[in-house]
Swiss-Prot record:
GO terms for cellular component: myosin II complex. This is Calmodulin. Ca(2+) 1 binds at D21, D23, D25, T27, E32. Ca(2+) 4 binds at D130, D132, D134, Q136, E141. Belongs to the calmodulin family. Calmodulin mediates the control of a large number of enzymes, ion channels and other proteins by Ca(2+). Among the enzymes to be stimulated by the calmodulin-Ca(2+) complex are a number of protein kinases and phosphatases. One of its GO terms (molecular function) is calcium ion binding. The modification N-acetylalanine is found at A2. The keyword Endoplasmic reticulum does not apply. The keyword Zinc does not apply. Residues 8-43, 44-79, 81-116, 117-149 form the EF-hand domain.
Amino acid sequence: MADQLTEEQIAEFKEAFSLFDKDGDGTITTKELGTVMRSLGQNPTEAELQDMINEVDADGDGTIDFPEFLTMMARKMKDTDSEEEIREAFRVFDKDGNGFISAAELRHVMTNLGEKLTDEEVDEMIREADIDGDGQVNYEEFVTMMTSK
């Protein structure tokens, strides 16, 4: 399944993996997974975190290594995000609930994830998703961005 990913996708997932892998040991533990989920405004229980890891933990060592992470991401991309998941993600970014994601809101969420972006990088991300050119991302643009592979 992971063999259907492009090199670009694999590079992106490598970056995402290192956001999760806080101590840089090459594996994601339930503790690290919990930290990232909470920074995204989620509040999973220990049991839910364990379930998430068990779903993809092919070698049964209780952690997720990069190949397992790739499998998980490939699987997630295949059953493309449900409407509800996309709406939920949009709400995480749209801090003030005005129906738009501004550069400041995007920067805030990315910083919470431990991803320090330059203003240029944030502006570039907004530009890529901002179809109508108003300088922010509305829900339709967000859906388009999330569902275009």
